[in-house]
Curated annotation (Swiss-Prot):
GO biological process: pantothenate biosynthetic process
Family: Belongs to the pantothenate synthetase family.
Name of the gene: panC
Organism: Rhizobium johnstonii (strain DSM 114642 / LMG 32736 / 3841) (Rhizobium leguminosarum bv. viciae)
Name of the protein described by the UniProt record: Pantothenate synthetase
Catalytic activity: (R)-pantoate + beta-alanine + ATP = (R)-pantothenate + AMP + diphosphate + H(+)
Subcellular location per the Swiss-Prot or TrEMBL entry: Cytoplasm
Amino acid sequence: MRVFSSIDELRHTLDALRRQGRTVGLVPTMGYLHAGHMELVSRARAENDIVVVSIFVNPLQFGPAEDLSKYPRDLERDAAMLRQAGVNFLFSPGVEDMYSRPMLTVVDVPDLGRELEGAVRPGHFAGVATVVCKLFNIVQPQTAYFGAKDYQQVVIIKRMVDDLALPVRLISVPTVRDSDGLALSSRNVYLSEAERRAAVIVPQTLDEAERLVADGLTDPVELEARLTAFLSREPLAKPEVVAVRDAATLQPVTSIADPVVVALFVRVGSTRLLDNRVVGSNRFVGNNRVAGGQSLPGKGVTR
């Protein structure tokens, strides 16, 4: 596995491989890799000649009071995991490589990026869309892989790709979960033992959503209220977002007829946990596809 920090060197190498007809898959990450990331890598390895994994803790997507400075980092460990998984290239630029001068250009999808998680993290999704667009321009992959846990992010990036006619196909890979159902996340390392035990209320709330809808509940406002009450059983859990939205567009719905996504953004201690589940009559939208050809995510995969 070759490691790059220079944009120009990576571009030069990939250009030569593309001229040979090689296909390129990209897995964008912020590092501190876990089994969920490696599931993305495995999918990319199966579908592409060349796999590029990027590790970049992007300052544009962190607010002034967020965890940029303490976000977990271990590049040596991550590189060893990627090397063992058969990744071809690791792109790990510094901030000075990605943003050699202050960014005056921002990619924003405001109608989608200021809802749900974006409502409590102003500017977050503009930072995400900007760095992902830049990574797409640098790597020029045919396919890029994202975890379904970040459901809103996938919908926003898909809209960005469609609106800007970017020649990349997006694949949303089902969430990987621990044995008790908690979605794997690099931020789980922040949780104390008591908080980790409490965090299981998040996937349990999604189970409750699925049960209520299966039992015939069709009022999204009532579903949100009942899920908020369910979360309140755990005193360490403080819900910031409990929302029921159209699974394809993230728009509010008046009735749970078509598939909806239940989106949760819950603070446990000082750690924000993000999770979601698609519920409804089935798990598909349109031509059974969303986010570049993938089925909508359901419960995910247990590790």
